[in-house]
Amino acid sequence: MRLRGIDVAAYDPSPNASAVLDDVMADAVSAWDALGLSTDHVGSLTLYASIEEAVADAGLIQESVPERLDTKHSTLAAIDAVAPADAIIASSTSGYKPTDLATSMSRPDRLVVAHPFNPVYLLPLVEIVGGQQTSLGTIDRAMDTYRALGMHPLHVRKEIDAFIADRLLEAVWREALWLVNDGIATTEEIDDAIRYGFGLRWAQMGTFETYRIAGGEGGMRHFMEQFGPALKWPWTKLMDTPELTEELIDTIAEQSDEQAAGRSIRDLAQERDRNLVAILRALESVDAGAGKTITNLRALQA
């Protein structure tokens, strides 16, 4: 929001919240500068000592507390009690359905899930999910608001745990855990399989368009007829997960440490951002995928 020139009021009880937010903002400005986007009119950030002060004049309120239902209930209830009547209340939850989140609220009609992806200043997707009592007006306003921020709002029309993207990621994560657990691949080898292979295809074309090409002139129907039966082969363990024993956790942690090769989390995050900037600029040059959102951002800044 601040990169779009919007003043932000925040509440975070963490004693180092200000320093963490300053670091994130510095990385965000650096990334936008690398994309050639304007950072001349960054909005202000004011940290308040209470939720009541932080939301007093807000038009959009983004709840991003830890993924504990009781914590979210108490936080959303506190926001709901003092937020302006026309404010959109959005939860960043990655898994809870909005109907389950809204049980502590007197105005559940103004709650949506608005699930972003990290780093939010470079990944444009935000999943918008309404609950049973969310008004259509709230959903429409949320879609318009996030679009005006330069994001790509995706309306998830039916409530489901974990929405769309995280359900897909969970399937890959489960299989990756099995591959490490069974000694078939290391964490680095699994990451290599993604970043040197299908990850590049996914970044610009997704799954279904990729498989449509694989179907040749017969398209998706031919692909499904040819490869559909393989879904019944015992290749995967997607409906099961290995037990997270101390041994498995140690193995993954040790392999991940080796893979990092001494780079700090900040080093890795900045490397990630540089790579994402390069990918976004390449996609923008051919008007494909998330590159379109960069084009839209330039138009919004013009």
Language model features with spans:
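Rossmann-fold NAD(P) dinucleotide-binding segment
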Residues: I51-L111
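Helix N-cap / loop-to-helix initiation motif
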Residues: S14, S135, A185-E189
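Short acidic low-complexity segments
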Residues: L37, H41-D57
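NAD(P)-dependent Rossmann-like dehydrogenase/reductase catalytic/cofactor-binding core
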Residues: R4, M151, T187-A302
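NAD(P)+-binding Rossmann beta1-loop-alpha1 motif at the extreme N-terminus of oxidoreductases
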Residues: M1-A34
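Rossmann-fold dinucleotide-binding core
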Residues: S91-K158, A162, D166
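Conserved Rossmann-fold dehydrogenase catalytic segment
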Residues: R147-A171, A185-D191, M205-Y211
